[in-house]
Regions:
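Residue-level recognition of oxygen-bearing side chains
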Residues: 21, 133, 146
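GST superfamily/GST-like fold recognition
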Residues: 53, 58-60, 102-130, 138-141, ...
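Alpha-helical packing segments of well-folded alpha/beta enzyme cores
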Residues: 81-88, 137
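Solvent-exposed, charged/polar functional surfaces in cytosolic regulatory/catalytic domains
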Residues: 87, 91-95, 140
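Terminal-tail/helix-coil boundary detector
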Residues: 150-152
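Domain-level recognition of soluble alpha/beta enzyme cores
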Residues: 43, 132-133
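GST-like domain detector, emphasizing the conserved glutathione-binding G-site
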Residues: 1-79, 83, 93, 100
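The C-terminal cap of the DNA-recognition helix in HTH/winged-HTH DNA-binding domains
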Residues: 97-98, 143
């Protein structure tokens, strides 16, 4: 099988992997996932952005720095992630200008997907102080009812 974390067991013998697939499954029928149309496609657009333009830079730089202790053997790779990560943060910051959330007027799973590694981007060497729209958005997400921080 596809032994990955996270994994969601659905029923007795069905399993779902990949965080964004799990989010889409769990959000179906809720306000966190638009029912159809352009807004739903925009949620998917931001989730694909997170997977292909954000996570490969920010999450990998964070892993090398925080969990591996930035070993000399990985320093070049770590430094190579900074430009792409900052490019992703710039795209996000520009999009959030004049907006509270990534899609529509309320939080969606697009916000959840992007929040995950963005709020710990500093652990990968990314300085968020130059991205004030992101900083405001992070605080907005953290003030939502039911917000639960990441377990260390």
């Amino acid at each position: 099988g596809n032994e990955k974390i996270p994994v969601l067991q659905v029923g007795e013998s069905e399993f779902l992997v990949e965080s964004n697939a799990i989010l889409n499954f769990l959000a179906e029928g809720s306000a966190l996932l638009p029912g159809s149309g352009l807004d739903r496609a925009k949620v998917l657009q931001w989730q694909f952005f997170e997977q292909y333009s954000h996570e490969p830079y920010i999450a990998v730089a964070r892993f090398i720095n925080k969990y591996l202790g930035l070993p000399e053997s990985r320093k070049e790779e770590y430094l190579s992630k900074q430009e792409g990560g900052n490019r992703a943060l710039s795209v996000m910051d520009s999009h959030l200008a004049g907006r509270d959330y990534f899609v529509g007027d309320s939080p969606t799973i697009a916000d959840i997907s992007l929040y995950a590694y963005t709020h710990v981007a500093h652990e990968g060497g990314f300085d968020l102080s130059g991205y004030q729209n992101i900083v405001r958005w992070l605080r907005r997400i953290e003030s939502l009812p039911g917000y639960c921080g990441m377990t260390p």
